[in-house]
Amino acid sequence: MQPFVLYNSEQRKKVEFVPRKEGHIDMYVCGMTVYDYCHIGHARVMVAFDYIIRFLRSQGWKVRYIRNITDIDDKIIKRANENGETIQQLTTRFIDAMNEDAANLGCLAPDEAPKATEYIDQMQNMIGNLVNKGAAYPASNGDVYFEVTKFEKYGRLSGRKLDDMQAGASERIDVEVEKKHPFDFVLWKHAKENEPSWASPWGNGRPGWHIECSAMSTCCLGNHFDIHGGGSDLMFPHHENEIAQSEASTGEQYVNYWMHVGFINVDGEKMSKSLGNFFTIRDVMEKFHPEVIRYFIVSSHYRSPVNFSDVALKEAKTSLTRFYHSFKAYQQVYGQTTTEALDQSFIERFNNAMCDDFNTAEAMAVLFELNKELNRAVKEEQADQATVLYSTLRHLTNILGLVQHNVDDFLKSDIGQDALALSDAEIEDFIQQRVDAKKAKDFAKADSIRQSLLEQGVVLEDTRQGTVWRRAD
């Protein structure tokens, strides 16, 4: 189990990870508010924590991964009313869609996926504790607010100071006369007509957004756990508020390490519905294989902002297809033969990259070099070395959740390649014509077939076992 460093958003630097319990990592990631289909920003968060967890488990860590579901929220209520359906009908439909999208992207299911509506009692207990400690107060309108001035460390995650902040800095914050301070945030919302509500000591109502994650995370992982993650947009106010209410309630440190995934931009601007540059995962999957989307996400460091475009996805498809071509070239000669003997130099370099704040950009550079060596070994008919390199590459791509599909199925799919002019069957037919031409000593025809295929993006390689082919990179 190799030590690793990660960027802790709270400390604003990379630090060595020290577990609370030897060999174990407890991780909570903020999930989706299920009122619509997941967008490509959600995909990045899902995929990033998926490959992080896959890598940690490959290193021997026992990771407990919790990702919540917000199934009660203003947007959910509004959308259900617009659609003329119940909240449960709406949320069930979009939870199913979310899980389907995640599976298509190759994401493993979390160990638990708690729903907010299943933890109302625990939320009320935490709110009651905060009121009793004087950190929260009921307002005359039936709401209950957290009093930010009672938590001295408020702002430590985002680096903000209350005195410097202005009300309205976030779309999640409303200036209301019931508040003692503009940044006091709601823990319990009083019931409104035709909205779902639960009985509470403060009257009928429903929980605020921030208290949901504090209650679910501490119920699932305890008052103090290792890693909390989410998108960069959640750092303030959501994660800041989680820290305040959790630590004010329990008196313990809430989380040791905070991880935040970078934004996805479109033409240099943050993706958003208001700008009209918003893409759901399903929108993108109509044009690109889901593993191409995963590759696009994996190929950049999780903290770096990335620019989303068709061009970027086409580049991702080209790069991913190289691995599939290499696997096909190997399998044409050696079948599915693998070995437990792996190339430790490539393993070490890959692990070193991933242990440096999960640097997938550097890890992918290692895989491309390994892929090049595999192609060389296959071409030079070095069977033993080819098998070791193939086995190593398969092992490492598995860790990142890449090259997970049947090679022929991926390469034949319309979204796996640009509907290339020649099908696999047509290529095989041309190869047989070339073999027949060589047997007839018609070398001019054989060379012509090779050149014609090359011009159509197909490379032939003659080996002792026969002719193998691959599509050009």
Swiss-Prot record:
ATP binds at residue 273. CDD domains: Anticodon_Ia_Cys, CysRS_core. Keywords: Aminoacyl-tRNA synthetase, ATP-binding, Cytoplasm, Ligase, Metal-binding, Nucleotide-binding, Protein biosynthesis, Zinc. Disulfide bonds: none annotated. It is found in: Cytoplasm. Binds 1 zinc ion per subunit. It is an enzyme of class 6 (ligase). A motif ('HIGH' region) lies at residues 32-42. GO terms for biological process: cysteinyl-tRNA aminoacylation. GO terms for cellular component: cytosol. A motif ('KMSKS' region) lies at residues 270-274. InterPro entries: Cys-tRNA-ligase, Cys-tRNA-synt_Ia_DALR, Cys-tRNA/MSH_ligase, Rossmann-like_a/b/a_fold, tRNA-synt_1_cat_dom, tRNAsynth_Ia_anticodon-bd. Coiled coil: none annotated. Its cofactor is Zn(2+). GO terms for molecular function: ATP binding; cysteine-tRNA ligase activity; zinc ion binding. The keyword Metal-binding applies. It catalyses: tRNA(Cys) + L-cysteine + ATP = L-cysteinyl-tRNA(Cys) + AMP + diphosphate. Belongs to the class-I aminoacyl-tRNA synthetase family. Monomer. This is Cysteine--tRNA ligase. It comes from Acinetobacter baumannii (strain AYE). The gene is cysS.
